[in-house]
């Protein structure tokens, strides 16, 4: 199913930790390599933490788990682009071509593979990969957004200005007060408070393609 239905049409697939590594009841890193298309090696020895350090657009952060984890995989693919590294240091820790890469991106003719050795990827990084893959993001603040054809509900996380990015220009009003908040625009800016629920109603419904209305 993955090979026939997912790895095509320009899709991006994000893999976490060690997908496909169980073969015939044991750890087999070649199963992971075949599934993700990214060559990795499995570290030998004792269990240890899995924390990845990332530097993107000048912003440095780490994610993963401090718990002892096994198996531990490290990227060793010269055709892949390393986006994150083992946090413990810049030394080359393992053999077989691995250099400590723990977040790797590799492009194929029909799809893109992104693999993260560490779990617990933060929402900001997930959102970045989703947006690059063509997913429409309504908010970059981490608000919960529940969209439908002519309604949008938002559960707000911050005491700040919400900038809601709409998929297309339209006119929207506050469903509680009937106040028009934006006209013929694909951007809405609204002062919000943490825990507030915003419900928007579109008042220029999308045309029905069957009758042009």
Describe each PLM feature range.
Residues 1-213:
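A conserved amphipathic helix/loop scaffold
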């Amino acid at each position: 199913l993955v090979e026939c239905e997912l790895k095509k049409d320009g899709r991006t697939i994000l893999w976490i930790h060690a997908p496909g590594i169980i073969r015939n009841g044991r750890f087999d890193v070649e199963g992971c390599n075949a599934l993700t298309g990214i060559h990795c090696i499995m570290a030998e020895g004792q269990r240890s933490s899995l924390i990845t350090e990332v530097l993107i657009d000048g912003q440095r952060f780490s994610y993963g788990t401090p718990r002892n984890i096994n198996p531990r995989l490290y990227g060793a693919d010269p055709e892949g682009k390393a986006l994150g590294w083992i946090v413990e240091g810049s030394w080359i820790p393992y053999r077989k071509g691995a250099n400590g890469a723990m977040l790797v991106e590799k492009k194929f003719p029909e799809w893109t593979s992104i693999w993260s050795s560490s779990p617990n990827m933060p929402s900001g990084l997930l959102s970045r990969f989703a947006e690059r893959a063509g997913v429409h993001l309504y908010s970059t603040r981490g608000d919960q957004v529940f969209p439908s054809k002519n309604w949008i509900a938002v559960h707000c996380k911050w005491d700040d200005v919400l900038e809601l990015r709409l998929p297309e220009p339209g006119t929207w009003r506050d469903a509680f007060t009937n106040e028009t908040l934006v006209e013929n625009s694909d951007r809405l800016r609204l002062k919000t408070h943490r825990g507030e629920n915003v419900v928007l109603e579109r008042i220029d419904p999308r045309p029905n393609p069957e009758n042009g209305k």
